[in-house]
């Protein structure tokens, strides 16, 4: 059993206590008695002590503790777990399901509860250390996911549905969910090894147990038999004699699942009665229903090979079965439901009855490993179906073994009677982290659960901490709308009531396969009171449970299918029942729980500002989505990325209008990837908004696919506005063209999405949200596209762009900082505009499109939204389209979210009709964020435009074309900020002329914008010069940067990138479709963009535009390459070298926090880290290596840390011993194979292939992904064209030589001074006016005359010590010199050359002015006519040198003055003869 989570705080009512005989068997989770799990809970004893009074442990700590199934107290071999005990554990795990504590080995079925408590206490000290270690190991394993996948498949066995089978029936309830055992044995073996280490302790514990058991009336203290006749409570002490062999790992091949029979012969023969002692009880239990020896469709099964001991045990188990009354097995299978604490007092007896039989059944050996929260993503199936029910209380209910058959039968009946009462109201089964994200763990619960009527292992309300355990005045038990399947069932239940049908009939008539859960939110409906559904009678309750299970199963299959189709589990938006849901793009689903109906919601609202990661589960909606989003816990620390999801409560102002009827109507079936929005647009209640904060991928790639995908996911978003135009693709949002026509052409995929979306939209309409929305909803950029229902723009707010799932109003509320009034105005204007300009509004489909139109008011909003930065972060995802996500959060988040959000979109490239449009969402996000950085208002508008543009990105180019017009209106509204030239990028640049297409324009824009203002750069992430973030695709970025980027970019880094991308698409400059030209984009989106920008302009770092410009210029031309016409995500800004790791890392240096010791080799570094940094930690363990991705993340496992630090010390410690082969390997074995290959190759004379054979075999995965990985390592994923060949080498050498002519090495320049004039000073001495050469670097000056009157002065100046202006001149001189032919005297003093040539001691000086003017341009000629000029020693050559030098000067001068109009090839003027120059001492210049 993977570790159970025992929540001591959850209030363990020991139901077991109710019946004394069973009480010991049922260990309340906290009870220390559970030594086998080694996680002894200190307050456990109290539960045990009072048999009849269920005690709620006051332990406030909610931390789940992991309990492992195997008994650590075993004295036997390290790996051996007595099969009996294993079975028992399995049984309890499966049987009690979540509610049951593991009553495995440690649990003795003792007659008196008190005795067991005593025993537990006595064992506690002995097992405590071991338990601690085991706990550490378990946690480590779970955290490192080493445990492997515990995959439970929830398959109902045919018979299920009865609360408790008749005593006569031996078969276990068929519909118990069977769960597969873990696939990885490595982890299990590891655990067994740990156990062996603790062997001695175990032996001691065992003795203690036996002693304790002796005190109890146990017929066989050491009975290995799993279940003795129930009559005699057997203390099943772990019997050392039954070692369980380490599990064999069964590899799963997708094509042919291994037959269980082959792998586990013992399974083949397992009696279907479930009492089999085989260690793989889980499979046996599953087989029980079908009576076949095979376990149903398990792909991963870890089965222990049968050993003689096990066979013996099995036989014994069979024998025991003979004696055992049939009831027991069924009882075992039943899951025990621990009654809510309040109820428990009234009906103590029934609870035990649920699990009357002691231990006979072998439930699944491995219970679903509940991990620490947030380690892993819940498998979508579970998320949807299981409603993330809390497992924390899993161990709570104890297995109650009935002393007599009668007791068992009675108990079963009692259980049936009380089932309704026990129903956990709205318990949330928070299966939060299952060991693996990829595999769904079934609620292990379940084998016994169904009969008990608790299919999900739901915990009692009491345990869950729900106050609603007691029936209401009418004797009905409220079922908090169970999220997910639960809500669906509710719906069915209500329908059934209305139609007077039985629930099952209803279910049958309406298959839940569609996942179309519609939550009936109508409060007027039958049975709904206070938004709670009350189950009227036990029959209905049973039906409810059955249907719930059915729904789960259907969902599971469906989800499995869906999962493959859908993208990696993106964060699913969890839509609350009442929430206006927008379908969210898979990537980050915004959790829109606007609904506070459910208890979960209420919780969520309480934690409104928590990150949703945990809250997600709270949110009812979560269950609904098949895909569970992984939400990371928010880490606010600066080091952490912004929380993925921020939950905020929605302001009441949010249009709560969606009328429940509208909500009720069933939406078109959502595509698997689109979450149907279950939530009706019931925004009215202040719902919680969870917005994923993750920014979109760094640079939203314009990849059509991604956009398409996003679009698909968002597809549900109906066009929010009434506009007829179909929702434009996500991306379309940016392009101005996107406007009304916008989505039409691209609409293809969008349309599909649209189908469902329109419903949402209708909902919104119906709910009157629209009018309302327009006011409350700001065109917050945040509104996520997918949530079509909400947006002021129609539902633009609703778009559930991943970030903003809820309606705009929600968004607004989410950003509480935003001033409401302004937002309202803005939203009104926005919504109005959107109505009027459905185009943009409609666009919402695409992220970018989402951006609300920007109206002047909106702009105001933007300013207000400055406040929003936090919100923005959350938005940023959703906004990605909305430029509003300027927030740096986007950028920083972008990195984090980058992957999450980008991938999702990318899959749907084809889907995005816009084609390019898809990528835009991310881009828009980024741009938005950068934009946001931009200065608020103007910037906003510009940014908006740019972001629109950028988001439009490639899409824009297409989309832009038609819709630009609508953009204009937006632009007008935006006027306030910038004249946003209608469609043209104007908005972004604000410069009136944006000739985006004209480079000239761009240039002017560039300057214009540069001066325009310091833009806030959202963050470095925003990308190159911030522009990057805007245009996701490097291509668009490059184009934008090159052509318009300046125009847009400078205005805002984000803007620039956005506009650049937009401009690209528009502009011819980038021939690639890449981004729509900013004009178009900005034009159309600009209003929207600006609106969104207004929505969130978080404060950002201010960066001088000049910098941005420079960066954009520096973007390599190669970025504009054909390969980029397919947008690629740019992962890192190009020159980000240091990237937080402090620049280049050196081998042997320890970068541990506060430790920078240098070691000769990596092996010494590893030793150092082990001794000084790992061994010195006492726990929790954390890696403090600066720059480590898990820096300071605590782990409970030292061994994890030991393994982890290897990655910092160079994990490949084994170097090939063959000379000339520098390969290193991470293991001795790999090295050995490699070295052998060297020699085998030579022996076999396969010299030709030796190279190949000497390399370690390339893993298949690497071969498959090698190319991808290779590109990933580059700063740009796209190919970089650097043609580095001999020509380049020569050029570099030339430059080095030219530099040497100037600097003479040593980073210093030696200046030769020529005396130009003399004067007599007051003291009677002479001073010379020295002109320094190389000239034009340092200023001339008067110096005392040289003693020898040579008038030769020298001065050596270090470049680093020069003034900035001087350095600039040196730079321009060199840049000019690099274009000249090499001449050793290039920078030689003209006078010196002249003297050498002419031989005049006085050093005749060439007439600088004359020569300079005449020869200014010579050099260029020289460049082109190099043949003409030979560097001979002749005087002409020297003259030429002088002229070339002067040309250098003149060119540099021209450059510095930015005058570049001199003719390309001015006529060559022969320099005047130097002999005519006569030196003189006169003050006049010679």
Swiss-Prot record:
Listed Low complexity bias regions: 8-28, 93-102, 199-217, 272-291, 648-669, 776-802, 831-844, 873-903, 911-935, 946-957, 1027-1092, 1431-1440
Which Gene3D superfamilies does the record cross-reference, listed alphabetically? Answer: Classic Zinc Finger
Region Disordered: list its residue ranges. Answer: 1-102, 150-180, 199-225, 250-360, 568-618, 633-669, 711-735, 776-806, 826-1096, 1242-1269, 1397-1486
**Comp. bias intervals (Pro residues):** 349-360
Q: In its UniProt entry, what is this protein called?
A: Zinc finger protein jing
Q: Which GO terms describe its molecular function?
A: protein-containing complex binding; zinc ion binding
Question: Gene symbol?
Answer: jing
Q: Where in the cell is it found?
A: Nucleus
Basic and acidic residues biased stretches: 852-868, 1244-1254
The residue range of the signal peptide is none
Which stretches are tagged as biased composition: Polar residues? 40-80, 166-180, 327-337, 936-945
One biological process term from GO is:
regulation of transcription by RNA polymerase II
Concerning what turns on (or off) its expression, the entry says: Induced in ventrally positioned cells in pair-rule ectodermal stripes by expression of sim.
- Acidic residues: compositionally biased ranges: 1405-1430
Family matches, as SMART domains: ZnF_C2H2
Role of this protein: May functionally interact with Polycomb group (PcG) and trithorax group (trxG) proteins to repress transcription. Required for Egfr pathway function and MAPK activity in CNS midline and tracheal placodes and for CNS axon development and tracheal tubule development. Required to establish the primary axon scaffold in the brain and for lateral positioning of longitudinal glia, longitudinal axons and neurons. Required for glial survival. Required to establish the proximo-distal axis of the developing leg and for wing vein and alula development.
**GO CC aspect terms:** ESC/E(Z) complex; nucleus
Q: Which InterPro entries match?
A: AEBP2/jing_C2H2-ZnF, Znf_C2H2_sf, Znf_C2H2_type
Organism whose genome encodes this protein? Drosophila melanogaster
Tissue specificity as recorded in UniProt = Expressed in the imaginal disks of the leg and wing.
Keywords attached to this entry? Chromatin regulator, Developmental protein, Metal-binding, Nucleus, Repeat, Repressor, Transcription, Transcription regulation, Zinc, Zinc-finger
Q: Does the keyword Membrane apply?
A: no
């Amino acid at each position: 059993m993977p570790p159970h989570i025992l929540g001591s705080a959850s209030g363990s009512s020991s139901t077991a206590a109710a019946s004394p005989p069973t009480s010991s068997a049922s260990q309340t989770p906290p009870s220390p008695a559970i030594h086998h799990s080694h996680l002894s809970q200190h307050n456990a004893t109290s539960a045990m002590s009072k048999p009849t009074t269920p005690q709620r442990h006051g332990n406030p700590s909610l931390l789940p503790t992991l309990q492992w199934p195997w008994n650590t107290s075993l004295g036997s071999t390290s790996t051996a777990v007595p099969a009996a005990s294993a079975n028992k554990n399995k049984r309890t795990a499966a049987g009690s399901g979540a509610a049951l504590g593991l009553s495995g080995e440690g649990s003795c079925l003792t007659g008196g509860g008190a005795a067991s408590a005593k025993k537990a206490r006595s064992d506690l000290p002995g097992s405590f250390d071991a338990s601690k270690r085991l706990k550490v190991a378990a946690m480590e394993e779970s955290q490192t996911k080493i445990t492997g996948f515990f995959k439970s498949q929830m398959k109902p066995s045919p018979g299920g549905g009865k609360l408790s089978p008749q005593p006569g029936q031996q078969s276990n309830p068929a519909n118990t969910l069977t769960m597969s055992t873990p696939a990885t044995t490595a982890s299990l073996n590891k655990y067994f090894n740990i156990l062996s280490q603790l062997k001695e302790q175990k032996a001691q514990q065992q003795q203690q147990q036996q002693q304790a058991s002796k005190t109890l009336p146990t017929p066989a203290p050491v009975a290995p038999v799993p279940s003795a006749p129930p009559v005699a409570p057997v203390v099943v002490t772990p019997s050392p004699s039954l070692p369980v062999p380490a599990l064999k790992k069964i590899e799963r091949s997708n094509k042919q699942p291994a037959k269980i029979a082959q792998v586990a012969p013992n399974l083949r023969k397992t009696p279907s009665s479930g009492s089999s002692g085989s260690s793989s009880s889980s499979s046996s239990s599953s087989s029980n229903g079908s009576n076949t020896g095979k376990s149903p469709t398990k792909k991963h099964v870890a089965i222990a090979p049968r050993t003689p001991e096990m066979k013996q045990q099995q036989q014994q188990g069979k024998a025991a079965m003979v004696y055992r009354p049939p009831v027991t097995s069924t009882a075992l299978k039943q899951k025990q439901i621990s009654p809510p604490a309040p109820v428990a007092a009234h009906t103590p007896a029934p609870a035990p009855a649920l699990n009357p039989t002691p231990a006979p059944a072998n439930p699944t050996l491995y219970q679903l490993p509940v991990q620490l929260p947030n380690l892993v993503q819940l498998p979508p199936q579970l998320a949807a179906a299981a409603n993330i029910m809390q497992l924390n209380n899993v161990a709570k209910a104890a297995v109650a073994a009935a002393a007599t058959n009668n007791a068992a039968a009675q108990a079963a009946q009692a259980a049936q009677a009380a089932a309704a009462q026990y129903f956990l109201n709205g318990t949330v089964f928070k299966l939060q982290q299952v060991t693996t994200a990829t595999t769904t763990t079934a609620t292990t619960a379940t084998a016994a659960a169904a009969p008990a009527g608790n299919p999900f292992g739901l915990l009692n309300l009491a345990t869950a901490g729900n106050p609603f355990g007691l029936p209401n005045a009418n004797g009905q038990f409220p079922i908090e709308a169970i999220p997910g399947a639960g809500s669906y069932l509710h719906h069915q239940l209500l329908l059934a009531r209305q139609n007077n049908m039985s629930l099952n009939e209803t279910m049958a008539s309406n298959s839940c396969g569609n996942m179309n859960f519609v939550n009936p939110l109508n409060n007027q409906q039958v049975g709904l009171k206070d938004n709670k559904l009350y189950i009227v009678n036990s029959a209905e309750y049973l039906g409810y449970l059955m249907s719930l299970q059915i729904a789960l199963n259907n969902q599971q299959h469906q989800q499995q299918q869906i999962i493959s189709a859908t993208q990696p589990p993106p964060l699913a938006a969890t839509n609350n029942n009442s929430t206006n849901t927008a379908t969210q793009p898979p990537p980050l689903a915004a959790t829109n729980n606007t609904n506070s109906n459910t208890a979960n919601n209420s919780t969520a609202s309480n934690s409104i500002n928590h990150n949703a990661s945990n809250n997600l589960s709270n949110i009812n909606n979560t269950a609904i989505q098949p895909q569970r989003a992984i939400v990371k816990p928010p880490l606010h620390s600066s080091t952490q990325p912004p929380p993925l999801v921020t939950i905020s409560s929605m302001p009441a102002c949010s249009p709560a209008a969606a009328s429940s009827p509208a909500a009720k109507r069933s939406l078109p079936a959502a595509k698997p990837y689109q979450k149907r929005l279950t939530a009706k647009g019931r925004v009215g209640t202040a719902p919680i908004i969870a917005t994923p904060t993750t920014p979109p991928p760094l640079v939203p790639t314009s990849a059509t696919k991604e956009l398409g995908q996003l679009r698909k996911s968002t597809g549900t978003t109906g066009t929010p506005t009434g506009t007829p135009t179909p929702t434009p693709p996500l991306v379309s949002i940016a392009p101005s063209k996107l406007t009304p026509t916008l989505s039409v052409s691209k609409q293809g995929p969008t349309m599909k999405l649209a189908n469902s979306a329109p419903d949402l939209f209708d909902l919104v309409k119906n709910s009157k949200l629209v009018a309302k929305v327009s006011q409350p909803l700001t065109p917050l950029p945040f509104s996520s596209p997918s949530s079509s229902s909400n947006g002021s723009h129609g539902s633009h707010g609703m778009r559930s762009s991943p970030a903003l799932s809820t309606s705009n109003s929600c968004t607004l509320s989410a950003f509480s900082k935003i001033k409401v009034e302004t937002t309202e105005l803005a939203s009104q204007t926005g919504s109005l505009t959107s109505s009027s300009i459905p185009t943009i509004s409609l666009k919402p489909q695409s992220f970018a499109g989402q951006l609300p139109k920007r109206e002047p008011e909106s702009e105001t909003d933007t300013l207000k939204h400055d406040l929003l930065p936090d919100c923005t972060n959350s938005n940023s995802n959703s906004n990605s389209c909305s430029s509003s996500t300027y927030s740096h959060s986007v950028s920083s988040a972008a990195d984090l979210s980058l992957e999450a959000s980008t991938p999702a979109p990318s899959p749907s490239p084809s889907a995005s009709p816009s084609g390019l449009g898809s990528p835009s969402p991310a881009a828009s996000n980024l741009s938005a964020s950068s934009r946001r950085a931009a200065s608020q208002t103007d910037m906003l508008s510009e940014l908006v435009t740019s972001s629109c543009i950028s988001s439009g990105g490639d899409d824009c180019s297409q989309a832009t074309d038609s819709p630009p017009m609508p953009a204009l209106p937006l632009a007008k509204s935006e006027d306030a900020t910038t004249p946003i030239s209608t469609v043209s990028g104007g908005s972004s640049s604000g410069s009136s002329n944006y000739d985006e297409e004209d480079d000239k324009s761009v240039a002017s824009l560039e300057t214009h914008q540069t001066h325009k203002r310091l833009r806030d750069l959202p963050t470095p992430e925003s990308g190159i010069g911030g522009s990057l973030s805007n245009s996701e695709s490097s291509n668009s970025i490059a184009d934008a940067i090159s052509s318009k980027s300046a125009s847009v970019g400078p205005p805002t880094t984000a803007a620039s990138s956005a506009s650049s991308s937009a401009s690209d698409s528009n502009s011819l400059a980038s021939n690639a479709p890449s981004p729509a030209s900013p004009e178009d984009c900005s034009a159309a989106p600009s209003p929207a963009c600006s609106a969104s920008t207004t929505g969130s302009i978080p404060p950002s770092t201010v960066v001088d535009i000049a910098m941005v410009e420079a960066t954009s210029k520096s973007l390599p031309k190669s970025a504009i390459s054909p390969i980029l016409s397919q947008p690629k995500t740019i992962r890192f800004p190009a020159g980000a070298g240091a990237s937080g790791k402090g620049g280049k890392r050196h081998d042997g240096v320890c970068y541990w926090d506060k430790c920078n010791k240098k070691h000769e080799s990596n092996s010494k570094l590893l030793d150092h880290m082990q001794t000084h940094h790992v061994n010195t930690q006492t726990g929790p363990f954390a890696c403090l290596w600066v720059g480590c991705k898990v820096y300071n993340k605590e782990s409970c496992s030292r061994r994890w840390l030991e393994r982890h630090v290897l990655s910092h010390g160079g994990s490949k410690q084994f170097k090939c011993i063959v000379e000339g082969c520098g390969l290193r390997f991470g293991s001795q074995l790999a090295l050995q194979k490699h070295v052998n290959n060297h020699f085998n190759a030579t022996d076999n004379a396969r010299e030709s292939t030796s190279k190949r054979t000497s390399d370690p075999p390339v893993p298949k995965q690497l071969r498959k992904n090698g190319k991808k990985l290779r590109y990933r390592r580059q700063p740009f994923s796209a190919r970089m064209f650097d043609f580095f060949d001999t020509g380049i080498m020569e050029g570099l050498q030339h430059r080095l030589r030219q530099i040497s002519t100037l600097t003479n090495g040593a980073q210093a320049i030696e200046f030769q001074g020529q005396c130009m004039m003399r004067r007599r000073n007051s003291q009677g001495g002479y001073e010379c006016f020295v002109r320094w050469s190389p000239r034009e670097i340092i200023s001339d000056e008067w110096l005392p005359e040289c003693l020898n009157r040579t008038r030769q002065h020298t001065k050596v100046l270090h470049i680093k010590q020069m003034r900035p202006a001087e350095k600039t001149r040196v730079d321009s001189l060199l840049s000019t010199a690099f274009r000249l032919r090499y001449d050793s005297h290039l920078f030689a003093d003209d006078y010196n050359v002249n003297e050498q040539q002419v031989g005049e001691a006085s050093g005749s000086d060439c007439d600088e002015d004359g020569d300079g003017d005449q020869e200014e341009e010579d050099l260029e000629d020289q460049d082109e006519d190099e043949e003409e000029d030979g560097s001979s020693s002749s005087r002409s050559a020297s003259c030429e040198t002088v002229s070339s030098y002067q040309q250098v000067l003149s060119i540099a001068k021209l450059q510095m003055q930015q005058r570049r109009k001199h003719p390309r090839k001015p006529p060559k003027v022969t320099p005047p003869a130097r002999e005519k120059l006569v030196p003189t001492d006169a003050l006049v210049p010679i």
